């Protein structure tokens, strides 16, 4: 709940101060595996989608199986609350549909959509991106594409393994080395120590 409130507050503040479309408009949540990250992300997506001025919430996963798994989990929490897609064509229709408020998709489909649609109305909409497991796979090309194309966005990442400067490594072609450089400041933390203390793992 604290993580959800932190994200919603960040959306409110950065929207009021016109900081959407910048690193200051987002942030990341460090949640250990088994701490109810999917439920937290669902509640966040649901409440963010109801905020005044927010057009869509995109929940982005990095693999097709996670896409299906997340949809199943979301349906368990609230049937029909989110929209998943089997292809980029379906994703495009959902992005154009004002009633599709929460969309679950993969990085790959989002990348293809951006490649195929150089100009699109959705790029000017107020979009909240929530990346699940926001580590290396989201860095680089996809991140660059989003910040180039979308104008009024908030980027949030959930991760069990944040990358700090100490473990970022020197190699790689990407400018983004740490979770903070990609998503903004840490908004909430729930580590393995907290999970053990609470009896969740």
Segments (PLM) and residue ranges:
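RecA-like P-loop NTPase motor core of helicase/translocase proteins
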Residues: 1-201
């Amino acid at each position: 709940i604290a993580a959800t409130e932190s994200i919603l507050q960040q959306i409110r503040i950065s929207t009021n101060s016109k900081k959407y479309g910048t690193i200051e408009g987002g942030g990341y949540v460090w949640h250990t595996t088994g701490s109810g990250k999917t439920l937290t992300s669902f509640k966040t997506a649901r409440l963010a989608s109801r905020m005044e001025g927010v057009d869509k919430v995109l929940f982005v996963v990095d693999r097709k199986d996670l896409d299906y798994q997340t949809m199943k989990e979301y349906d368990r929490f609230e049937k029909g609350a989110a929209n998943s897609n089997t292809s980029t064509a379906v994703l495009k229709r959902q992005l154009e549909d004002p009633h599709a408020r929460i969309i679950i998709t993969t990085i790959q489909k989002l990348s293809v959509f951006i490649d195929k649609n150089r100009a699109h109305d959705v790029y000017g909409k107020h979009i909240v991106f929530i990346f699940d497991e926001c580590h290396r796979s989201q860095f680089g090309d996809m991140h660059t594409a989003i910040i180039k194309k979308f104008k009024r966005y908030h980027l949030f990442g959930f991760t069990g393994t944040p990358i700090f400067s100490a473990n970022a490594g020197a190699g790689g072609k990407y400018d983004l080395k740490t979770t903070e450089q990609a998503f903004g400041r840490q908004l909430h933390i729930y580590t393995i120590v907290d999970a053990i203390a609470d009896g969740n793992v």
